[in-house]
Amino acid sequence: MQIYNSLSRRKELFTPAVPGKVNMYVCGITAYDLCHIGHARSAVVFDVLVRYLRHTGLDVTFARNFTDVDDKIIKRANEEGLTSQQVAEKYIDTFYEDMDRLNVLRADIEPKATGHILEMIALCEKLIAKGKAYATPSGDVYFRVRSFPEYGKLSGRDIDDMRSGARVAPGEEKEDPLDFALWKSAKPGEPSWTSPWGEGRPGWHIECSAMSEKHMPLPLDIHGGGQDLIFPHHENEIAQTEAALDKPFVRYWMHNGFVQVDAEKMSKSLGNFKTIRDILEGYLPEVLRFFLLTKHYRSPIDFTFDSMDEAEKSLKRIYEALSLARTERGRSKWSATPLPADVTAEFDTLDRAFDEALEDDLNTAAALGHVFGTIRLVNRLLEDKNLRKSAETLALLERLDGLVAKWMKVLGVFGREPEAFLSDLKECRIRRKGIDTTKVDALLEERKSVRAAKDFARADAIRDELAALGIEVRDTPSGAVWDVL
């Protein structure tokens, strides 16, 4: 598999340090608020990576942490009249609920920062002993950025350029404006722990270094997160870990792209902040997951309701095809009509292309393209009145079951019973569009009556009236059925 390594800024052949085993760490949430669509993207991207690596036979140990002590958590605790621990527990619970709805697998290891205070203190002590960090009279501990010559190697930033715009804030006791906090002295009303430098709490960056070192052998095979974490968080992780341990921290760095909303940066100040729960009020969770896979993970993705509608339509087409394929397989008689020679070859090619897309830096967008190619091929066979009855078509439909199982295993979508998904989708669209089903049923009943009376003009007028409400009517041998456009 080729992976784009943010450190080398190029694709590299992925080879685990220990053949057959992968140690992977992804930065998790700071537990102070509901998860937004940016969190969803990172979670889904690395969930698919774990799924695919396991699909290829690798033994993956996946860790994703929780930051449960932080300035933002303390602020939220004061706002809500809770302790910091209560706030963190509350939002860790909502994180799990959201991830379960998005079919994101649980990590194998889910460390919390507050459970690793001793490891963080020990790491600080190592850095101080090596002259890479220093304690201040007030009990803060800072990392000496200039003591690490490779600082900036991940983000590509020049240390002198960073120095030109840096300032020491009033009250800080930094030797250099570039230095960052490893340990913060206690402030009134904040959670704190006993340390050699007095009561205090860890800085954000030291948390991931301590947790990853405790639970996994270093260097990590893969460390992931959003592009917003490259600097300063991941840059600082590298500096403090490699300075303390004198060995590489991570072999492959992976970062997913930003999520925009209507082509603008998502922010509360712009009023375009979208939590996962906001979105799932109007869409099925599988639609959101599918949408997040329609772009390459390193590319930015623009969330709009139009793009969600398109993702919903695409997913619906796939499930409709799977439903039709299942119905056709119930046929009792099959013919000996041969399929065109290229059909089976095309089916095989599309299957291989799906895997090849994911081998190429986890290109889910291209992989979904091959899923659609497979669905179009199946539809083409089922729309042909002769080929749909062929025993060779039955063989391909049986193979389709295996492909769908693989798509579900790797991408985490297409795993529901088609009829159940389509029924839930219809109900979801009815709620989202505020459709009055009583009115729809009454119009359909009237249409049935006027058709029986051969008043086709009125029947057509009712169809148009329903279409204006966003309702599509199809006449079948067993009667009219309707769906939401």
Curated annotation (Swiss-Prot):
<dbReference type="InterPro" id="IPR015803">
    <property type="entry name" value="Cys-tRNA-ligase"/>
</dbReference>
<dbReference type="InterPro" id="IPR009080">
    <property type="entry name" value="tRNAsynth_Ia_anticodon-bd"/>
</dbReference>
<comment type="similarity">
    <text>Belongs to the class-I aminoacyl-tRNA synthetase family.</text>
</comment>
<dbReference type="Pfam" id="PF09190">
    <property type="entry name" value="DALR_2"/>
</dbReference>
<keyword id="KW-0862">Zinc</keyword>
<feature type="binding site">
    <location>
        <position position="237"/>
    </location>
    <ligand>
        <name>Zn(2+)</name>
    </ligand>
</feature>
<comment type="subunit">
    <text>Monomer.</text>
</comment>
<feature type="binding site">
    <location>
        <position position="27"/>
    </location>
    <ligand>
        <name>Zn(2+)</name>
    </ligand>
</feature>
<keyword id="KW-0436">Ligase</keyword>
<keyword id="KW-0030">Aminoacyl-tRNA synthetase</keyword>
<dbReference type="GO" id="GO:0004817">
    <property type="term" value="F:cysteine-tRNA ligase activity"/>
</dbReference>
<keyword id="KW-0963">Cytoplasm</keyword>
<dbReference type="InterPro" id="IPR032678">
    <property type="entry name" value="tRNA-synt_1_cat_dom"/>
</dbReference>
<dbReference type="GO" id="GO:0005829">
    <property type="term" value="C:cytosol"/>
</dbReference>
<protein>
    <recommendedName>
        <fullName>Cysteine--tRNA ligase</fullName>
        <ecNumber>6.1.1.16</ecNumber>
    </recommendedName>
</protein>
<feature type="binding site">
    <location>
        <position position="233"/>
    </location>
    <ligand>
        <name>Zn(2+)</name>
    </ligand>
</feature>
<dbReference type="InterPro" id="IPR024909">
    <property type="entry name" value="Cys-tRNA/MSH_ligase"/>
</dbReference>
<dbReference type="InterPro" id="IPR014729">
    <property type="entry name" value="Rossmann-like_a/b/a_fold"/>
</dbReference>
<feature type="short sequence motif" description="'KMSKS' region">
    <location>
        <begin position="265"/>
        <end position="269"/>
    </location>
</feature>
<keyword id="KW-0479">Metal-binding</keyword>
<dbReference type="Pfam" id="PF01406">
    <property type="entry name" value="tRNA-synt_1e"/>
</dbReference>
<dbReference type="Pfam" id="PF23493">
    <property type="entry name" value="CysS_C"/>
</dbReference>
<keyword id="KW-0648">Protein biosynthesis</keyword>
<keyword id="KW-0547">Nucleotide-binding</keyword>
<dbReference type="InterPro" id="IPR056411">
    <property type="entry name" value="CysS_C"/>
</dbReference>
<feature type="binding site">
    <location>
        <position position="208"/>
    </location>
    <ligand>
        <name>Zn(2+)</name>
    </ligand>
</feature>
<dbReference type="InterPro" id="IPR015273">
    <property type="entry name" value="Cys-tRNA-synt_Ia_DALR"/>
</dbReference>
<dbReference type="GO" id="GO:0006423">
    <property type="term" value="P:cysteinyl-tRNA aminoacylation"/>
</dbReference>
<feature type="short sequence motif" description="'HIGH' region">
    <location>
        <begin position="29"/>
        <end position="39"/>
    </location>
</feature>
<feature type="binding site">
    <location>
        <position position="268"/>
    </location>
    <ligand>
        <name>ATP</name>
    </ligand>
</feature>
<dbReference type="GO" id="GO:0005524">
    <property type="term" value="F:ATP binding"/>
</dbReference>
<keyword id="KW-0067">ATP-binding</keyword>
<dbReference type="GO" id="GO:0008270">
    <property type="term" value="F:zinc ion binding"/>
</dbReference>
